[in-house]
Amino acid sequence: MSLTITPLSPALGAQISGVDISRDISAEERDAIEQALLQHQVLFLRDQPINPEQQARFAARFGDLHIHPIYPNVPDTPQVLVLDTAVTDVRDNAVWHTDVTFLPTPALGAVLSAKQLPAYGGDTLWASGIAAFEALSAPLREMLDGLTATHDFTKSFPLERFGTTPQDLARWEATRRNNPPLSHPVVRTHPVSGRKALFVNEGFTTRINELSELESDALLRLLFAHATRPEFSIRWRWQENDVAFWDNRVTQHFAVDDYRPNRRVMHRATILGDAPF
């Protein structure tokens, strides 16, 4: 096995080379990638011209795949969703968020492939919830560890943007009905590494349940700002056929919306996870 892992920043991020994910990777390669993901939280691979079927196959080596209730998907490969700025409003990605935390079992991770890019712009940033939690003072860590927060699908997918046609409205209403607001711990324990991470995000978290509305709003503002500090984050400048694979259990990300009216097309396969604790 010739797989090479190059760390990119102290908090998170590593580049992997020496593996071709268009083919069915070996068990040894799969285990090495999983260990790298646990350590570095987000992995980047250059020059991976994969098709949707290959992308889904690679992602499925790490768990069952999720079909997104709102975003369009590849017709013959529904496990791969399409983020195409020419056809879909993707402004919700231009906010710090952890994918699908409105689910009882949010995603374990996601595999994102760059298909069409603007000449410049359209970078993505990731931030480590582990680094953010560990940098807090001990009294604040202790307080947060016993709190829960509400996550709401409609915060990132409001009706006025995602219910503009009868078909979209029906899809939005069904998604809201099937995904009512729910609670997750403010501090999540990684089910494999045991490390603790902040698990609130601006995209879906609406309030801290045990606090008053005033206290909740103030604390969430603090946590949202703290969790995305530069020293806890990494910024990736995409090239076509790049692939990113991140641990959604302990990270959040932000897609920079600075390239309009140019087009950006990305494919994402999302891996189902387990209930946060």
UniProtKB/Swiss-Prot annotation:
NCBIfam families the record matches: PRK09553.1
Class of this enzyme: oxidoreductase
Gene3D superfamilies: Clavaminate synthase-like
InterPro entries found in the cross-reference section: AtsK-like, CHASE_dom, TauD-like_sf, TauD/TfdA-like
Cofactor details (free text): Binds 1 Fe(2+) ion per subunit.
Gene Ontology molecular-function annotations: identical protein binding; iron ion binding; sulfonate dioxygenase activity; taurine dioxygenase activity
Known partners and oligomeric status: Homotetramer; dimer of dimers.
Organism: Pseudomonas putida (strain ATCC 47054 / DSM 6125 / CFBP 8728 / NCIMB 11950 / KT2440)
Binding sites annotated in the UniProt record for taurine: 68, 71, 93, 100, 268
Keywords attached to this entry: Dioxygenase, Iron, Metal-binding, Oxidoreductase
GO biological process, one term: sulfur compound catabolic process
Gene Ontology CC annotations of this record: cytoplasm
EC number(s) given by UniProt: 1.14.11.17
Bilayer-spanning residue ranges: none
Gene of this entry: tauD
Protein family membership: Belongs to the TfdA dioxygenase family.
Cofactor entry: Fe(2+)
Reaction catalysis annotation: taurine + 2-oxoglutarate + O2 = aminoacetaldehyde + sulfite + succinate + CO2 + H(+)
Entry protein name: Alpha-ketoglutarate-dependent taurine dioxygenase
Record's function text: Catalyzes the alpha-ketoglutarate-dependent hydroxylation of taurine yielding sulfite and aminoacetaldehyde after decomposition of an unstable intermediate.
UniProt-annotated binding residues for Fe cation: 97, 99, 253
Residues noted as binding 2-oxoglutarate in the record, renumbered to the chain: 124, 253, 264, 268
